[in-house]
Amino acid sequence: MKFFAIAALFAGALAMPTTEIEARTDKAVCPSGLYSNLVCADVDVLGILCLHATSPSETPRDARHFQEICAKVGKQARCAVLPVAEQAVLCQRPAGVSA
């Protein structure tokens, strides 16, 4: 029993990543916290709901690039709280993106 506990502790210590895990969102595009999900949406309903929201086809370098990626497919660049089933709850325009 003691051997198992010590072996599990040792295995857990070995399994910890040695380098920092990179964030999937660019902090320059969307703020960290609630509005951290990047989506391209057809319609933004008063910032409460974004319709037909999909993830961008590529990782944006900055806010302008994010806007260009979404514009290619005829959508608007938005930062959302909860994207579910092509709908995103609570959306806002990223800083540096024009309407």
Swiss-Prot record:
Disulfide bonds join C30-C79, C40-C70. Residues 1-15 form the signal peptide. Induction: Under normal conditions on SDAY medium (Sabouraud dextrose agar plus 1% yeast extract), the expression of hyd2B is increasingly down-regulated to a hardly detectable level on day 6. Hyd1A is the most active at transcription level under normal culture conditions, followed by hyd1B, hyd1E, hyd2A and hyd2C in order. One of its GO terms (cellular component) is extracellular region. The keyword RNA-binding does not apply. Keywords: Cell wall, Cytoplasmic vesicle, Disulfide bond, Secreted, Signal, Vacuole. Pfam families: Hydrophobin_2. It is found in: Secreted; Secreted, Cell wall; Vacuole; Cytoplasmic vesicle. InterPro entries: Cerato-ulmin_hydrophobin, Hydrophobin_sf. Disruption phenotype: Does not affect radial growth and multiple stress responses. CDD domains: hydrophobin_II. Its main location: secreted. It comes from the Eukaryota. PANTHER family: HYDROPHOBIN. Belongs to the cerato-ulmin hydrophobin family. Aerial growth, conidiation, and dispersal of filamentous fungi in the environment rely upon a capability of their secreting small amphipathic proteins called hydrophobins (HPBs) with low sequence identity. Class I can self-assemble into an outermost layer of rodlet bundles on aerial cell surfaces, conferring cellular hydrophobicity that supports fungal growth, development and dispersal; whereas Class II form highly ordered films at water-air interfaces through intermolecular interactions but contribute nothing to the rodlet structure. This is Class II hydrophobin B.
